[in-house]
Amino acid sequence: MTKLKLLALGVLIATSAGVAHAEGKFSLGAGVGVVEHPYKDYDTDVYPVPVINYEGDNFWFRGLGGGYYLWNDATDKLSITAYWSPLYFKAKDSGDHQMRHLDDRKSTMMAGLSYAHFTQYGYLRTTLAGDTLDNSNGIVWDMAWLYRYTNGGLTVTPGIGVQWNSENQNEYYYGVSRKESARSGLRGYNPNDSWSPYLELSASYNFLGDWSVYGTARYTRLSDEVTDSPMVDKSWTGLISTGITYKF
């Protein structure tokens, strides 16, 4: 278990939870997360997860992602954002002999704009961000519609969304170069951009004043541009996490 993997998962879980209306200025917690990777013969990861959330008038922070509000009111929230993208591939971690001869794919820092618009029927959440560390040089656009239901201490937020990956993003994480093909025996592959729909559900229950338990899950149906890669043997990816937090 590396610190990078643990913290990166924390970002993913914070992002998946879709916390746009914070219920407190600052909260700390811990939990456990399960991540299903799309790569061939790649084990499901189970990680402990730190939870650190802060919501202010000008700044917000969740996991290893944060932002500065350019506009912030009850209806609309626009911010400059940066976050650590947890997507990665380590050749030595694959159980497939051919996959072990591929190059590693690194996780990276993404930066861009995020926007949320709230109505009585739910809210729109969208983020457009690009790689800042010259790894993939890719762009990712995520857009979702969510509805928050609250009953006493229970809050449930289902959502449906779609993620667009640029050609560079898919090329880096799912493409197979000529050199890799010659080394591994896998066929070369050059994907285009893609759209992948997803469903997500998050829930929290407040008990004993400032203590809460939470759970979140996301199911992503991978596009053909991803599933056609010889690196991939699944049609979906998934995330489940649960834990406990304390609000200050």
UniProtKB/Swiss-Prot annotation:
Name of the protein this chain belongs to: MltA-interacting protein
Q: Does the keyword Membrane apply?
A: yes
Provide the protein's localization: Cell outer membrane
Transmembrane region(s): none
Indicate the secretion signal residues: 1-22
Per the record's keyword annotation, is Membrane included, yes or no? yes
Q: Which family does it belong to?
A: Belongs to the MipA/OmpV family.
| GO CC terms, sorted | cell outer membrane
Q: Name one GO biological process term.
A: peptidoglycan biosynthetic process
| Gene Ontology terms, MF aspect | protein-macromolecule adaptor activity
Q: What is the lineage of its organism?
A: Bacteria, Pseudomonadati, Pseudomonadota, Gammaproteobacteria, Enterobacterales
Q: Please explain the role this protein plays, according to its UniProt record.
A: May serve as a scaffold protein required for the formation of a complex with MrcB/PonB and MltA, this complex could play a role in enlargement and septation of the murein sacculus.
Keywords from the named record: Cell outer membrane, Membrane, Signal
Q: How does it assemble?
A: Forms a trimeric complex with MrcB and MltA in vitro.
